[in-house]
A protein has these predicted regions:
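A short, Lys/Arg-rich alpha-helix, primarily the initiator
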Residues: 1-15
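Short, charged recognition helix plus adjacent turn
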Residues: 64-74
Length: 74
């Protein structure tokens, strides 16, 4: 599940043409965010929310993309 969250996060970030640095915005290290996107490490919920906010993505939007991704795998 962690790997899937990171993968979806990366898809959203790239679709917005944002760099890791822009999304991290000092709330989290770029390296840590990169590891999260690759499914290597997790991040705190606070960091996750901050990064979503930096991309102007609501939690509901992320959940929508996540559920569509999961449903398409079935």
């Amino acid at each position: 599940m962690l790997e899937t969250f990171g993968k979806i996060f990366k898809v959203i970030r790239e679709s917005k043409k944002m760099s890791l640095k822009e999304v991290a915005a000092g709330d989290i290290s770029v390296a840590q965010l990169s590891r999260f996107e690759r499914g290597v490490n997790g991040i705190t919920l606070d960091s996750f929310y901050c990064c979503l906010k930096n991309m102007a993505v609501s939690l509901e939007e992320f959940q929508y993309v996540y559920h569509n991704y999961i449903d398409s795998d079935d």
